[in-house]
């Protein structure tokens, strides 16, 4: 089982906004991250990106993309998320469990592509449902459960 850590947590009150980084967040079973506009009763409650992928894009494109700018909720460090499959689960901290429901999504003009000219969620984003909620904090351990 792959292990890493939670690099960042980001939320926005409404869709279509750049997300803001927070130190901790309450994750609600079957809903998503409290105070995030993408939370709800659907399959894409929480979005995850690989921090190493963001760093690669920064190097290749000469950008300085940081947490929240790609519309992700969670950036994970130390796990190759390209090896995670739909149906796999991510355990964050001591109790929170997310189930990967989708990898990537339709690519459409968004606040991210208009601002940065690039978007990773359509190609590398993990979209998840919350199987078990709890409090998560920046730096928490992350483990892939298959």
Regions found by a protein language model. Name each.
Residues 1-146:
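Metal-cofactor-dependent catalytic cores
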